[in-house]
C-alpha cells in the first residue's frame, strides 16, 4: 500500500535505508546487503538523485516528492500483484505529480502490478486509470471506462468534479 502522506508513513528517527531494508527482510528472506541493493536499485528506477544520499538520510531531510518516491519504491519492492494507492500525489506540486504518476505507470507496466488509486484528483485518475468509479459520501455515483467517465459523464456530481480538474504538467510519454 502507498499511503497518502509518506512523511507520516516513514519513521523520522530512522534512516531510510534501515526502514526500507527491514521492510524487505520482513517479507522476503534476504541479507541486509541484498536488501540494501534491492532498495538502491528501486530508488534509482524512480529516478531519485544520489540514491546513496537518500538511503542514508532521515525522512525529514527529504522533500515531499522524495519521501513519496521512497514510499512507492518500498511498496513496489514487494512485487505486489495489486497495489492500493491512497492519494499518492496529494501533497505534491503538479510538476512532481506528473513525474510520480509517470513513474508509477512505468513500474506498473514493467512489473505487471494492478493499481487501485483512491484520489479526489480527476486529472491524476484520468492519467492512471483504465476504469473510474466516482463516489460521493460512500455512494457509487458513476462507473465506467476512463473515456466514458471523463469525456461523457452522466452524473451531475461527476460533471462538477470535472470542472475543477487541475492540469498535470511535465513530460509523460510525449503526451
Residue ranges and their predicted role:
Residues 77-81:
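A short, proline-enriched helix->beta-strand linker immediately N-terminal to the Walker B motif
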Residues 57-62, 66:
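Conserved ABC ATPase signature
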Residues 20, 72, 83, 96, ...:
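Hydrophobic anchor residue at the start of the ABC signature
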Residues 125-127:
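A short, surface-exposed alpha-helical micro-motif characterized by mixed small hydrophobic
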Residues 143-144:
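ABC ATPase "signature
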Amino acid at each position: 500500500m502507498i499511503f497518502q502522506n509518506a512523511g507520516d508513513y516513514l519513521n523520522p528517527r530512522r534512516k531510510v535505508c534501515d526502514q526500507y531494508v527491514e521492510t524487505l527482510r520482513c517479507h522476503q528472506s534476504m541479507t541486509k546487503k541484498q536488501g540494501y541493493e534491492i532498495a538502491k536499485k528501486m530508488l534509482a528506477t524512480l529516478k531519485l538523485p544520489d540514491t546513496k544520499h537518500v538511503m542514508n538520510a532521515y525522512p525529514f531531510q527529504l522533500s515531499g516528492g522524495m519521501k513519496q518516491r521512497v514510499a512507492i519504491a518500498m511498496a513496489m519492492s514487494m512485487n505486489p500483484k495489486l497495489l492500493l494507492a491512497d492519494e499518492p500525489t496529494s501533497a505534491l506540486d503538479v510538476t512532481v505529480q506528473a513525474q510520480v504518476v509517470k513513474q508509477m505507470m512505468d513500474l506498473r507496466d514493467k512489473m505487471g502490478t494492478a493499481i487501485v488509486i483512491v484520489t479526489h484528483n480527476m486529472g491524476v485518475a484520468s492519467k492512471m486509470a483504465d476504469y473510474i468509479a466516482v463516489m460521493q459520501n460512500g455512494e457509487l455515483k458513476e462507473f465506467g471506462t476512463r473515456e466514458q467517465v471523463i469525456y461523457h459523464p452522466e452524473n451531475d456530481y461527476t460533471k462538477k468534479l470535472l470542472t475543477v480538474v487541475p492540469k498535470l504538467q511535465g513530460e509523460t510519454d510525449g503526451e
